[in-house]
Amino acid sequence: MVAIFNFQSLLVVILLFICTCTYIRGSYPSLLEVRDKHSFSGLPRKAAIIGERLSPWVSACCLIMGLWTLYN
């Protein structure tokens, strides 16, 4: 099933996107720097900021979703 139509899959995709963007920004900060922060190209930068500022919550959500996927 497509991840857009399944809420659990959509959450997994969003969490993986946030974690990936945060990792990329930590390793290669110049990759996510864009001039127009309000366009679609600024979305990975915003996801990286969310991942940095809410890292305990994002990691807890990743852990919960991983266990949910494993046992479901």
Curated annotation (Swiss-Prot):
Belongs to the KISH family. It is a single-pass type I membrane protein. Residues 1-26 form the signal peptide. The chain crosses the membrane at residues 48-68. Keywords: Golgi apparatus, Membrane, Signal, Transmembrane, Transmembrane helix. GO terms for biological process: intracellular transport; protein secretion. This is Protein kish. Residues 27-47 are extracellular. Pfam families: DUF1242. Its main location: Golgi. It comes from Dictyostelium discoideum (Social amoeba). PANTHER family: PROTEIN KISH-A. Residues 69-72 are cytoplasmic. It is found in: Golgi apparatus membrane. One of its GO terms (cellular component) is Golgi membrane.
